[in-house]
Amino acid sequence: MESLFIKLAKYPIIKTERLVLRPVTLDDAEAMFEYASDKENTRYTFPTNQSLEETKNNIAQFYLASPLGRWGIELKSTGEFIGTIDLHKLDAVLKKATIGYIINQKYWNQGLTTEANRAVIELAFEKIGMNKLDAFHDKDNPASGKVMEKSGMRFSHEELYARMDKNEPGRFVTDVHYVLTKEEYFANK
């Protein structure tokens, strides 16, 4: 039986109506740095990048060293790189993963993140054979929860004192968790 990783390797590119999800390369560094260096854009995701070199290093360590289940989000109409989406915490035995995403704030509120999320969810259940996907967001970032809801995920629970904020020293984060099982996905398709 084909492993989850072999199945993922077969889908380096996913196309949607307005997007191309494709491997991230060092050529994406400047476009990624545009949002990765913006404190408002990275507020709830990862530490704000301080230099283009830091962004290049992050691309090499995160996307190039381990590319399976990680895609850059590109606008089909212009070829512009606008964000990333990934399946992480992959568990090949239980066939579950966590979805994470970030998009340049110039493209917020246009349904693009939801479109990318739906495409990854469809791939995970229909092609890869996943059993469960989850996602979480900082309680102070309800817009991310709306993406999860619009993508078919359901609220699971709140986790108080889940972690320390990466951008605001001393702040405890409450994470809001969403989940979608294969049974729920196919029942609502």
PLM segments and residue spans:
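Acyl-donor (CoA/ACP) binding surface of acyl/acetyltransferases
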Residues: 1-43, 70, 74-189
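Generic hydrophobic, helix-prone segments enriched in Leu/Val/Ile
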Residues: 8-11, 49, 63
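Juxtamembrane/interface motifs at transmembrane-helix termini
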Residues: 51-54, 63-65, 76, 102-104
